[in-house]
């Protein structure tokens, strides 16, 4: 009889120690979610030039496996939620090599490059820039490399993201 009671208490003790506190895990997850949502608000390191229109002799062409943006086309890039990042090819032409080129995607600053007569590179797309829809890549050169200064070159090209099946 004592063995039965001891066995029952042992099983109860092991079961009690093995359980997890789901309430605290849920609170931790909620706190992490709200923190990550706060951090996901997009801010741009360099502001997008206001009221800028195409100017200068610079040209850009974006390329995907489906084609490129020549003649105003918007090449298609297939993506889904499993794609964390994808590369988008960009060809730059007729930019001033002594100036930095500020690259924006959907008016959010991505990177600064030194490009000249003919330069090929790629940028990494992730998060919002991989959501289905039409997206815009903008290359801008400023006087004295000051993003608040006069725009010397301003050119845009588009690409379209479609849901991968």
Regions of interest found by a model, annotated:
Residues 6, 18-75:
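N-terminal, intrinsically disordered, polar/charged segments of Gram-positive cell-envelope systems
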Residues 13-16:
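C-terminal motif of bacterial Sec signal peptides marking the signal peptidase cleavage site
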Residues 127-134:
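Surface-exposed, short loops/turns at beta-strand junctions within beta-sandwich domains
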Residues 1-4:
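Positively charged n-region of N-terminal signal peptides that target proteins for export
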Residues 68-115, 120, 124:
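Contiguous segments within soluble domain cores/interaction surfaces
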Residues 142-150:
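Short acidic/polar inter-strand loop motif in beta-rich domains
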Residues 149-165:
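Short beta-strand elements
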